[in-house]
């Protein structure tokens, strides 16, 4: 039960802070765990790494903004925690199978 509460706590932390430049240290500190233990804990509970989960949340928010605003891809990338446009495009393509530009046009 404690593990589920810890997972909920870190998922809430990510949900409220995904747009910030979060580090593994910050995520693990939010549930008072060492980074190494936190990675193992998070992966066991969610079947993905903490950073994969964080990037997935960021990409989902970016998708929503791409389809509901006229903001530029660069603005959306930065607003969702990506401080490198090329990394955002690569990550977006990894999760969605297309570039943000193509997604916005579809």
Question: For the regions a protein language model found, what residue spans apply to each?
Answer:
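Basic/polar phosphate-binding segments, predominantly the helix-turn-helix DNA-binding elements
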Residues: 9, 13-15, 21-57, 71, ...
């Amino acid at each position: 039960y404690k593990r589920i509460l810890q997972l909920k706590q870190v998922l809430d932390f990510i949900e409220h802070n995904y747009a910030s430049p979060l580090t593994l240290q910050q995520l693990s500190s939010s549930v008072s765990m060492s980074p190494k233990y936190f990675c193992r804990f998070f992966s066991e509970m969610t079947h993905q790494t903490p950073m994969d989960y964080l990037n997935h949340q960021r990409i989902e928010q970016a998708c929503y903004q791409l389809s509901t605003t006229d903001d530029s891809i660069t603005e959306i990338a930065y607003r969702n925690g990506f401080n490198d446009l090329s990394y955002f495009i690569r990550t977006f393509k990894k999760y969605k199978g297309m570039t943000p530009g193509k997604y916005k046009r579809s």
